[in-house]
């Protein structure tokens, strides 16, 4: 039996985000192996650049470091950290143990944030690179859905009360528009990321200036060389000990905004499921309730809403962290950032995987939609009926009064008796309206009440959505599979 508290055992807590929800690729980006392997890569890049610029570092030392990037003794590192109470120095010693010839030049001139902060920036960049195509796929699936149903009339709702008609595709475009804004914001914040670079303990580069005997140009070159090796186009010119924690605010703000979009979309789907107009996918063997076998609960959408709320709250962490970074740095950030950055990305990853799964299997029930339209459309059509009567020679005021009385009677049947809306039957039975009886079918055609909805869908997809998705064409075929 595993000892109580062993990580990974059933006797120890594990984050559901990692163990239950998030994708393996996102979990790996925030794993210890990826983090500490990147630390070693950063030490190698630093040594290579220092050697190129003339410091006494041998090819043999460089090769030894290269050969041991993946040779990480996690047990030794944990023991060293317990002894030293310092995670970076624990890994300096652990790396040095398997690179004895290079041990003396590992971390030369650097501070802990050289590996810590630069690794975080690499992780943020790579995590954003994972989210971008996932969000693009969600938008693509919803765009297909919207295009297919661009002209399908449905009852609109304002205040969740019946309003004028729209189309199923046009409503979906409201969702897509928000997600397109999120995609643009994710891309912007990803492209705006800058490397911390090689800055020293308080950002002044004093240690490197000393190493290069006061040669400003070599210090600048060192910073640029390592930045280039890490794949960043530019580094911060100004830092304290850390990169400004405003970066974390920007990144998590975009993720929180994505959470708001997903929450709105999935709430709409849940409400439509209650109305029986639309459903998320429901597996053949899926059980909706342990007590009520008929239930078809929208559990995927509910999960998205649940996790989206968590994602929206996480932005408070970097806001408060940035506000308490006294002078060049305090350690108020460290423990908090270990939690909030990973949780934000694992949560965003989960809701995008889930929303893609939902969007790939949305089910629409046109007959239910049609029936609901029939219940409300007669009231909406009264103005058109009045106009038709006036054109046929009737009085607007007389017609308005007739319609008012018949509408109240029909509303009473619906609300007091639980019956169907029979306003049109009442109009058909009233001789006063005989001049337009033959026009009623045309006047009640739902498609005549949706305005330019279908044209708006087509233009929106062609002018805004498809161009935005073009860079992601090569990854569009990936399906979203949910285990739970």
Swiss-Prot record:
GO molecular-function term, one example from the UniProt record: (S)-2-(5-amino-1-(5-phospho-D-ribosyl)imidazole-4-carboxamido) succinate lyase (fumarate-forming) activity
EC annotation from Swiss-Prot or TrEMBL: 4.3.2.2
SUPFAM superfamilies given in the database record: L-aspartase-like
Modified residue annotations for N-acetylalanine: 2
GO biological process: 'de novo' AMP biosynthetic process; 'de novo' IMP biosynthetic process
InterPro entries attached to this UniProt entry: AdenyloSucc_lyase_C (IPR019468), Fumarate_lyase_CS (IPR020557), Fumarate_lyase_fam (IPR000362), Fumarate_lyase_N (IPR022761), L-Aspartase-like (IPR008948), Pur_lyase (IPR004769)
Modified residues (N6-acetyllysine): 147, 295
Functional pathway: Purine metabolism; AMP biosynthesis via de novo pathway; AMP from IMP: step 2/2; Purine metabolism; IMP biosynthesis via de novo pathway; 5-amino-1-(5-phospho-D-ribosyl)imidazole-4-carboxamide from 5-amino-1-(5-phospho-D-ribosyl)imidazole-4-carboxylate: step 2/2
Keywords, ordered alphabetically: Acetylation, Isopeptide bond, Lyase, Purine biosynthesis, Ubl conjugation
Reaction catalysis annotation: N(6)-(1,2-dicarboxyethyl)-AMP = fumarate + AMP; (2S)-2-[5-amino-1-(5-phospho-beta-D-ribosyl)imidazole-4-carboxamido]succinate = 5-amino-1-(5-phospho-beta-D-ribosyl)imidazole-4-carboxamide + fumarate
Residues the record marks as active site: 159 (proton donor/acceptor), 289 (proton donor/acceptor)
GO CC terms in record: cytosol
Cross-link Glycyl lysine isopeptide (Lys-Gly) (interchain with G-Cter in SUMO1): residue positions: 415
Binding-site list for substrate: 20-21, 85-87, 111-112, 241, 303, 329, 334, 338
Record text on subunit structure and interactions: Homotetramer. Residues from neighboring subunits contribute catalytic and substrate-binding residues to each active site.
Family of the protein in this entry: Belongs to the lyase 1 family. Adenylosuccinate lyase subfamily.
Function noted in UniProt: Catalyzes two non-sequential steps in de novo AMP synthesis: converts (S)-2-(5-amino-1-(5-phospho-D-ribosyl)imidazole-4-carboxamido)succinate (SAICAR) to fumarate plus 5-amino-1-(5-phospho-D-ribosyl)imidazole-4-carboxamide, and thereby also contributes to de novo IMP synthesis, and converts succinyladenosine monophosphate (SAMP) to AMP and fumarate.
Name listed for the protein in its UniProt record: Adenylosuccinate lyase
């Amino acid at each position: 039996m595993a000892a109580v508290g062993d990580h990974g055992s059933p006797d120890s807590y594990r984050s559901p985000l990692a163990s239950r929800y998030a994708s393996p690729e996102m979990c790996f980006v925030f794993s210890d192996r990826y983090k500490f392997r990147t630390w070693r890569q950063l030490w190698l890049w630093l040594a290579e650049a220092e050697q190129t610029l003339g410091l006494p570092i041998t090819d043999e030392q460089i090769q030894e470091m290269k050969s041991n990037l993946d040779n990480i003794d996690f047990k030794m590192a944990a023991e060293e950290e317990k002894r030293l109470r310092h995670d970076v120095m624990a890994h300096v010693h652990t790396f040095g143990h398997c690179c004895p010839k290079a041990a003396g030049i590992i971390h030369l001139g650097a501070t802990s944030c050289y590996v810590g902060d630069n690794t975080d920036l690499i992780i943020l960049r790579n995590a954003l690179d994972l989210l971008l195509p996932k969000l693009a796929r969600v938008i693509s699936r919803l765009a297909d859905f919207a295009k297919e149903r661009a002209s399908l009339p449905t009852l609109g709702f304002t205040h969740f009360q019946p309003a004028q008609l729209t189309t199923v595709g046009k409503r979906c475009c409201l969702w897509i528009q928000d997600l397109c804004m999120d995609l643009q914001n994710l891309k912007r914040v990803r492209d705006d990321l800058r490397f911390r670079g090689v800055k020293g303990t308080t950002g002044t580069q004093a240690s490197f200036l000393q190493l290069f005997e006061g040669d400003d140009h070599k210090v600048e070159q060192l910073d640029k060389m390592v930045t280039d090796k890490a794949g960043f186009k530019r580094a911060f010119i100004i830092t304290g000990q850390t990169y400004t924690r405003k970066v974390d605010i920007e990144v998590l703000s975009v993720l929180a905004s994505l959470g708001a979009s997903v929450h709105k979309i999935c709430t709409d789907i849940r409400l439509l499921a209650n109305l029986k107009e639309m459903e998320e996918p429901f597996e053949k063997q899926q059980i909706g309730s342990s007590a009520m076998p008929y239930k078809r609960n929208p559990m995927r959408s509910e999960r998205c809403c649940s996790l989206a709320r968590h994602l929206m709250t996480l932005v408070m962490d970097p806001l408060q962290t940035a506000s308490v970074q006294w002078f060049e740095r305090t350690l108020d950030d460290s423990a908090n950032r270990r939690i909030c950055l990973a949780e934000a990305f694992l949560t965003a990853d989960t809701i995008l995987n889930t929303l893609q799964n939902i969007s790939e299997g949305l089910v629409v029930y046109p007959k239910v939609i049609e029936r609901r339209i029939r219940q409300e459309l007669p009231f909406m059509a009264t103005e058109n009926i009045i106009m038709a009567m006036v054109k046929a020679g009737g009085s607007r005021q007389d017609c308005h009064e007739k319609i008012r009385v018949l509408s109240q009677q029909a509303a009473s049947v619906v609300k007091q008796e639980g019956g169907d809306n029979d306003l049109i039957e009442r109009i058909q039975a009233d001789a006063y309206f005989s001049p337009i009886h033959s026009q009623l079918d045309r006047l009640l055609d739902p498609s005549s009440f949706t305005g330019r909805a279908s044209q708006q869908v087509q233009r929106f997809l062609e002018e805004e959505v498809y161009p935005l998705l073009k860079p992601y064409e090569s990854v569009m075929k990936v399906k979203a599979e949910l285990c739970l």
